Amino acid sequence: MAASALAWLLLWAAGLVGRLAADISDARFSDGVRATCSEIILRQEFLKDGFHRDLLIKVKFGESIEDLQTCRLLIKHYIPTGLFVDPYELASLRERNITEAVMVSESFNLEAPNYLSTESAVLIYARQDAQCIDCFQAFLPVHYRYHRPHKKDGDTLIVVNNPDLLMHCDQEFPILKCWAQSEVAAPCSLKSEEICQWKNMQYKSILKNLTVQVPVGLTIHTSLVCSVTLLITVLCSTLILLAVFKYGHFSL
């Protein structure tokens, strides 16, 4: 009886040691594969000045990508309430082959001010950079929304979070196994209704978050602005009426 129990104990111990060795081997293999993976670097910046900006997104892969020609990159960006993207402008840009972006938010109001709007989502199919073999870039025009006037500070800060980086390749690459976190279903291309499984990629961002300052009005100027607006409205209406009575031709 004791010998049987001892034999079972030895078998259990051997199995445990085998599993631990396998786990350690897998962990070392995973660490080795990850160690050979170069980082995916994402950078986004605003171009132009004023209330109408261009958001430029650049993605650089390391040398572990052997052939990017078989891969497609999709950027899912979440536009904060302080900004908006014009879907009609996007349609015009798509027709001219300037960018490949489409709104995915169903309820969207272009005219809503910042405090009445909601976050919106945009899908941008990035294109390979002709000047960089391992680079993609995407372009998205954005516009400022109207903000409430402030009591003291004449500026407000808008924070643009980092986007989701999705990748789909016709063949497997080591980097996909290294940095893929999950799979996301999305259209294979802008002109296709076919759904592909995209890998949500982990990356390193140059900036933690992109920020931009928006000038806003001051509440202390409310009475002045209202008075001047009313005065100009009355003056222009009077001039229009005088011109109508002076140069207009009336017949009874």
From Swiss-Prot:
Q: Which residues bear sugar attachments? A: N97, N209
What pathway is it annotated to?
Answer: Glycolipid biosynthesis; glycosylphosphatidylinositol-anchor biosynthesis
Q: Does the keyword Ligase apply?
A: no
Signal peptide location in the record? 1-22
Q: Does the keyword Transport apply?
A: no
Membrane spanning residue stretches: 225-245
Q: Which UniProt keywords apply?
A: Endoplasmic reticulum, Glycoprotein, GPI-anchor biosynthesis, Membrane, Signal, Transmembrane, Transmembrane helix
Q: What PANTHER family does this protein's entry cite?
A: PHOSPHATIDYLINOSITOL-GLYCAN BIOSYNTHESIS CLASS X PROTEIN
User: What is annotated about its quaternary structure and interactions?
Assistant: Part of the glycosylphosphatidylinositol-mannosyltransferase I complex that is composed of PIGM and PIGX. Interacts with PIGM; PIGX stabilizes PIGM.
The entry assigns this protein to a family as follows: Belongs to the PIGX family.
Please state what the protein is called: GPI alpha-1,4-mannosyltransferase I, stabilizing subunit
Organism in which the protein naturally occurs: Rattus norvegicus (Rat)
The beginning of the lineage is:
Eukaryota, Metazoa, Chordata, Craniata, Vertebrata
